[in-house]
């Protein structure tokens, strides 16, 4: 066994029996006791055991299936709103171009196929990559899949700050995208709130509502934006991103090999 110190208060090791060699459980347990943390948090360990039990079939399967269906319903609802707005701008959810309405979800429709425009990853290996339906990345206007900036745009940081002030907290924020996760317990009522707030953002943006009205906490922290409108702020940040080609700079930063 490797000498590893388990510092987490709820560390667990999952062991799958080998087909050719039986695990020496006594030796394994003694070795584990030698290197584990001396201060386990039993309440956390108990919660992990409860969570594992909840995931057992059939109840766990039903809970996961419900989360998957809610995530798909959210994507379909966002596309319905886009259709209702007609030629006006709206947010997109990153994912396959077509979604079935049948139950349960079909694994095939979430696979990434080579050179599909929606994912932009080029010639991916067939059957190797699949989009997790419960992880929804919402795309804001301003940057296309090729990394080209539009004349106007709405940086995701502005949208997520707006959402936070209206009671919606997102997981992660990029330049022109933000991420939400449909974990167990996310219901139609909760994601409907997100759709409603995004519609309200669109209305406030189109009307260039003053920031002191729609983002009062932001203005309180940064009084210099008191007389600026929501569209004005979005345009200013977008123009800065575009001027300095921030999308390409950040991409190169991660792809460039380290120079020594």
Each language-model region and where it sits:
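Short, small-residue-biased leader/transition segments that mark boundaries at the very start
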Residues: 4-5
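Short beta-strand-to-turn element immediately C-terminal to the catalytic PLP-Schiff-base lysine
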Residues: 12-18, 55
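Short coil/turn connectors at secondary-structure junctions
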Residues: 8-9, 167
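Non-catalytic terminal extensions of PLP-dependent enzymes
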Residues: 58-258
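Short helix-loop capping/hinge motifs at secondary-structure junctions, enriched
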Residues: 18-26
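PLP-dependent aminotransferase class I/II
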Residues: 25-52
């Amino acid at each position: 066994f490797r000498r590893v110190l388990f510092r987490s208060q709820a560390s667990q090791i999952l062991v799958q029996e080998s087909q050719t060699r039986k695990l020496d459980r006594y030796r394994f347990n003694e070795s584990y006791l030698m290197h584990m943390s001396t201060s386990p948090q039993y309440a956390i360990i108990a919660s992990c055991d409860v969570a594992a039990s909840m995931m057992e079939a059939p109840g766990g399967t039903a809970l996961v299936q419900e989360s998957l269906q809610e995530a798909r319903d959210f994507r379909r609802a966002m596309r319905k709103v886009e259709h209702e707005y007609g030629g006006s701008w709206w947010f997109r959810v990153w994912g396959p171009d077509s979604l079935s309405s049948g139950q349960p979800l079909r694994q095939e429709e979430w696979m990434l196929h080579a050179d599909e425009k929606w994912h932009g990853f080029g010639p991916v290996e067939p059957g190797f990559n699949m989009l997790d339906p419960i992880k929804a990345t919402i795309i804001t206007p301003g940057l296309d899949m090729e990394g080209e900036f539009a004349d106007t745009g709405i940086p995701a940081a502005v949208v997520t700050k707006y959402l936070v002030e209206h009671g919606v907290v997102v997981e992660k924020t990029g330049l022109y995208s933000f991420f939400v996760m449909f974990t167990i317990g996310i219901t139609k009522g909760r994601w409907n709130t997100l759709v409603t707030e995004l519609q309200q953002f669109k209305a406030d943006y189109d009307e260039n509502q003053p920031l002191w009205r729609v983002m009062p906490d932001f203005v309180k922290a940064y009084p210099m934006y008191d007389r600026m409108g929501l569209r004005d702020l979005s345009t200013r940040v977008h123009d800065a991103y575009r001027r300095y080609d921030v999308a390409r700079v950040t991409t190169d930063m991660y792809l460039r090999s380290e120079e020594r």
